[in-house]
């Protein structure tokens, strides 16, 4: 869509839309899978490397409901450690940009994890 609209490639960022799940609807902006939202979000994070089309990948998982579902935490602010874990795994799996509510903690976790990958 962006390329058809003549947006320069250097301004395109892929966002796999974690937490944005609708099973019904029409058009290209509706999820066309039969699984539940938790399975969908986990699958996307596990397979981020397969999304690479020479564009940066932005991930936004901080405080998302899938983390609350896994941890049994309904209050988003109680999901700090789950958010940091999901963000770090996302970067390991290919995310280039992280949008987070926890900038300092996420930066530290990713910095440590990256040392194990070298």
Where are these regions (language model features)?
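Active-site-adjacent loop and "lid" segments of alpha/beta metabolic enzymes
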Residues: 1-4, 8-10, 20-118
């Amino acid at each position: 869509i962006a390329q058809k609209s003549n947006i320069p490639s250097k301004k395109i960022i892929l966002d796999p839309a974690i937490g944005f799940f609708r099973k019904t609807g029409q058009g290209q902006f509706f999820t066309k899978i039969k699984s539940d939202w938790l399975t969908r979000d986990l699958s996307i994070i596990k397979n981020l490397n397969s999304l690479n089309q020479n564009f940066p990948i932005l991930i936004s998982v901080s405080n998302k409901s899938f983390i609350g579902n896994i941890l049994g935490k309904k209050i988003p602010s109680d999901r700090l450690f789950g958010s940091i874990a999901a963000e770090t795994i996302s970067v390991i799996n290919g995310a280039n940009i992280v949008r987070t509510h926890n900038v300092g903690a996420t930066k530290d976790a990713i910095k440590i994890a990256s040392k194990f990958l070298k």
